[in-house]
Structures are given as structure tokens and as C-alpha cells.
Amino acid sequence: MADLAKIVDDLSSLTVLEAAELSKLLEEKWGVSAAAPVAVAAAAGGAGPAVVEEEKTEFDVILVEAGANKINVIKEVRAITGLGLKEAKDLVEGAPKAVKEGVNKAEAADIKKKLEDAGAKADVK
């Protein structure tokens, strides 16, 4: 049997064009087609269920309404976002607005709970 390491070295040194030509020659010699398994796999995949929806991984926390206790909501928005007093006040008064965007599910739920505890109405989208 031929030295396998030498075969691997020889194959590794081939250019892309040489590898394509080798592939064609092997297909002819062995009577196979490299494209057939791909077509069969694609056809089999089409028979399965339709596109499976990926679970959403990024969420936006929306301040829907400030509620009666606006001062506490402003304090909480400042703590969550790191905004200054004026920016946080403008955000709260301009509701509905996004407080935090692109956070994971656990963080979004935590922020929503903090806002609701402060007296606001919040939503996670």
C-alpha cells in the first residue's frame, strides 16, 4: 500500500484548479458524481418541516407609561441606562420609548421588573 502521508502531502500541495481536475478524473474512474449527494440531501431537507423559527435572543425593554410615581421611574431609568438626569427625564416623559435595546431575555425581564416596581408600565419586545 502506498505511503498515506505522501498522498496527503501531494494532495495538500494541489492548486484549486488541479483539485477540481482530480475530482473530475476520480468521478469518471469510479463512476460517481460529487454533486449527487448534495442534491439528494437538499431534496430530503425540503420534505421536512418548513423553516423553523429561531428563538429570539435579543430583546428591547420599552417604557410604555411612567405612571403616577414619575420621580422613582426617572431614578430607575438613570440606574439602568446610566443617563444623566435631563436625558432620563426626557425619556420617561416621552414614553413610550425604548429604555434598553438588544439585551438578553433574563436582563430584559429584570429591567422590566425594576421599572414596574418603580411604578411604570413596561413591555419587553
UniProtKB/Swiss-Prot annotation:
Lineage: Bacteria, Pseudomonadati, Pseudomonadota, Alphaproteobacteria, Hyphomicrobiales
GO molecular-function terms, A-Z: mRNA binding; structural constituent of ribosome
Name by which UniProt lists this protein: Large ribosomal subunit protein bL12
Family the UniProt entry places it in: Belongs to the bacterial ribosomal protein bL12 family.
UniProt keyword Transmembrane helix, yes or no: no
GO biological process, one term: translation
Gene that encodes it: rplL
Keywords: Ribonucleoprotein, Ribosomal protein
Gene3D superfamilies in the record: 3.30.1390.10, Single helix bin
Subunit structure: Homodimer. Part of the ribosomal stalk of the 50S ribosomal subunit. Forms a multimeric L10(L12)X complex, where L10 forms an elongated spine to which 2 to 4 L12 dimers bind in a sequential fashion. Binds GTP-bound translation factors.
Entry function: Forms part of the ribosomal stalk which helps the ribosome interact with GTP-bound translation factors. Is thus essential for accurate translation.
Taxonomy, superkingdom: Bacteria
PANTHER family, per database record: 39S RIBOSOMAL PROTEIN L12 (PTHR45987), LARGE RIBOSOMAL SUBUNIT PROTEIN BL12M (PTHR45987:SF4)
UniProt-listed HAMAP family: Ribosomal_bL12
GO cellular component: cytosolic large ribosomal subunit
Database matches in InterPro entries: Ribosomal_bL12 (IPR000206), Ribosomal_bL12_C (IPR013823), Ribosomal_bL12_C/ClpS-like (IPR014719), Ribosomal_bL12_oligo (IPR008932), Ribosomal_bL12_oligo_N_sf (IPR036235)
